[in-house]
Amino acid sequence: MGLSTRDILDMGSLSRKDISLVLDTARSMKEISLRPVKKVPTLRGKTVVSFFYEPSTRTKVSFDVAAKRLSADSISLSVATSSMTKGETLLDTVKNLERMSPDVVVIRHSSAGVPHMLARHVSVPVINAGDGMHAHPSQALLDMMTVQEKKGRIEGLRLAIIGDIARSRVARSNVEGFLKMGASVVLAAPPTMIPVGVETFGADVTHNVDEAIAGADVIMMLRIQKERAAAFLFSTVREYARTYGLTANRLKNAKKDVLIMHPGPVNRGVEIAPEVADGPYSVILDQVENGVAVRMALFYLVMGGQRDAGD
């Protein structure tokens, strides 16, 4: 049995069964990355076209590596060298490229809703690699994979997300995903970084970081999204780090088996101290590693795969 949806647009488009299928498939995919030859012919003859309208390191490279590990051809379109610089719309660009018969489109865009718009107008699967402040489903899935891998479960755990919640698509997707899989979530941030309508998220909210940390099984730190804010939302960076940053001293109040996560890029010394980011509780690099496995699973499943692709 495959996914119940053609497109991966947000966590709302995935059922609990879909999420479990992705995570189970990703575990099989991770084994491929541990082999001496990290490649299988599963998607040979398939083509992935990627559009990244925002800067990206981990996500862009991860999708590219994922496609190539499954033997798919991966083509990344540079906006700067495309006809969009001549006035062509994104929709026209994609519809023209669709006639070249790609098998899946991956898109990151600064405007919320763009992947949904494309999905309505093209006949191939669309994977959202992040749209504005709205959603980042593959990030939430890799985060859930990492927690499940380290804790053996997601259900019943407590996730604390600390930082710029208002402007974070990662926060929104993780809240929805973890709640759907039976975890509880607490959001901690200054009032200027809590979104309007947060009461609809289904998560607890506090402005006290130490309170959020104390009961958490998993702590996810978020950077300040300066590129999405009209002005800095705290008095000074130093004051923000002192009040909301995760330090070794603050971590003493956490559970002894707590996991520390960060979607990256990390601003060391601001939202998280270097010794915490590099410390024994950190699974930040595990998240990066699992990102490849999750995106391999997504490519495989949206192209019609049912489960095991390890051969």
UniProtKB/Swiss-Prot annotation:
Query: Which InterPro entries does the protein's record reference?
Result: Asp/Orn_carbamoyltranf_P-bd (IPR006132), Asp/Orn_carbamoylTrfase (IPR006130), Asp/Orn_carbamoylTrfase_sf (IPR036901), Asp_carbamoyltransf (IPR002082), Asp_carbamoyltransf_Asp/Orn-bd (IPR006131)
Could you confirm whether the keyword Chaperone appears in this record? no
- What is the purpose of this protein? Catalyzes the condensation of carbamoyl phosphate and aspartate to form carbamoyl aspartate and inorganic phosphate, the committed step in the de novo pyrimidine nucleotide biosynthesis pathway.
Name of this protein: Aspartate carbamoyltransferase catalytic subunit
**Which residues are recorded as binding carbamoyl phosphate?**
R58, T59, R108, H136, Q139, G264, P265
Q: Name the Gene Ontology molecular function terms of this record.
A: amino acid binding; aspartate carbamoyltransferase activity
Which GO annotations describe the biological process of this protein?
A: 'de novo' pyrimidine nucleobase biosynthetic process; 'de novo' UMP biosynthetic process; amino acid metabolic process
So what does this thing catalyse?
carbamoyl phosphate + L-aspartate = N-carbamoyl-L-aspartate + phosphate + H(+)
Which EC class does it fall in? transferase
Question: What is the scientific name of the source organism?
Answer: Desulfosudis oleivorans (strain DSM 6200 / JCM 39069 / Hxd3)
Subunit: Heterododecamer (2C3:3R2) of six catalytic PyrB chains organized as two trimers (C3), and six regulatory PyrI chains organized as three dimers (R2).
Family per record = Belongs to the aspartate/ornithine carbamoyltransferase superfamily. ATCase family.
Q: Which residues form a coiled coil?
A: none
Annotated binding of L-aspartate, by residue: K86, R169, R223
**Pfam families the UniProt entry points to:** OTCace, OTCace_N
CC annotations in GO: cytosol
**Which pathway does the record list?**
Pyrimidine metabolism; UMP biosynthesis via de novo pathway; (S)-dihydroorotate from bicarbonate: step 2/3
